[in-house]
Amino acid sequence: MINPAEVTNYNRTQSELQEFILFCINVAGKKSSIEAPKLEVFLERAKDVTAKHRKSELMKDASPFDCIRALIKLGRLNEIMHWAKLSPYAQRYNSYVAVSKIKDLQSVTLNRLLQVPGIGLKTARFFLSHSREDFDEPMLDTHILHFLRDQGYTDAPKSTPSNENTYYYFANIFKNIARQLGKTVTDLDLEIWKQYSKTQ
């Protein structure tokens, strides 16, 4: 299971990356401590269902994407998502179907991730920041935006901007602050998350 307090891992296997991208999709706009166990329940159930259907214990070791593709073929993905309470169901279903088509998450690009329904700039950057050491771009969440307002950028929005120009404008400000502090974007982001998530 993904530990929401320790998401940074630059040495994940393909299977672990698959679980992590599903986690990233699920927690968008939701509480990670609630969504992480739901994903675990979904993956366990998905493995059980596909293993029983194929009458093979080998499916118990299948990757998350293998299980999703098998559930799609069985016509049971939506059922298992409801069983695990992975809502909003239609949105998650579309995201899971699309993301399971990505062959290699170790080399996936930001633009390829953005083609998946339900993955925006924040989710894509979150995934890449916490799975690739060389990716040092901010994900503008409510905590970072609150931090920016506290730093005097009072025009920083309260929620993640959907306009790309606005997003990049505030992302660059945050990158500059991190550099001035001698920190990586990911490290400063984690510090801010720990500090601001306690106060909200």
Language-model-detected regions and their locations in the chain:
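C-terminal accessory module of base-excision DNA glycosylases/AP lyases that mediates lesion recognition
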Residues: 1-19, 89-100, 106-108, 115-200
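Glycine-/proline-rich flexible loop or hinge segments
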Residues: 4-7, 19-27, 75-82
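Extended cationic-aromatic binding surfaces that line active-site or macromolecule-binding grooves
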Residues: 14-46, 168
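Generic hydrophobic/packing signal
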Residues: 23, 27-30, 39, 67, ...
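Amphipathic alpha-helical interaction segments
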Residues: 29-37, 49-53, 103, 134, ...
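Alpha-helical ds-nucleic-acid-binding substructure associated with the helix-hairpin-helix region
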Residues: 44-117
